[in-house]
Amino acid sequence: MYWQKIPKTSEKNYISGYEALNIPNENGDIADWHPRTYLSSQNPNEYIKTYKLDETIGNVGIKNKTINFPYKAEVYIANFVRAIIDIIIFSERDIEIKSLYGCRNDFLTDKEEKELFEELIEILKKGHKKSDKIVMFLENEYPRK
């Protein structure tokens, strides 16, 4: 097994999703606990997956910072809230969203959990093309709000 290589990133092509959830944030915390699943490969030349910027959402939650895992590098990477939002809006199948159920309690601090809800509501107000996926997630994660 090899750790995947760090790709070239930019504000419009950045690390996000489960990959970002498995890279320690500035506090050294990780949200998900499966780095081998999302950051390793049998192929020594494989790169970490990147995401293309969704223009409706913009660059909220994407920062240029130095990461120390799997290698030290300066990259554009989503914070945990944005990583979850990207999983929702880039999902091709409902199972990908269902795999996030419980994430606000498992992955996020109270502050991040509130930020996730507020960001998703803002995206809905903009009429995002994946609004149905966002509603599906919100109905499960925030049933009383």
Where do the language-model regions lie?
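Hydrophobic alpha-helical interaction segments
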Residues: 63-145
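Short gly/ser-rich loop at a beta-strand->alpha-helix junction or flexible surface loop bordering the NTP-binding
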Residues: 1-66
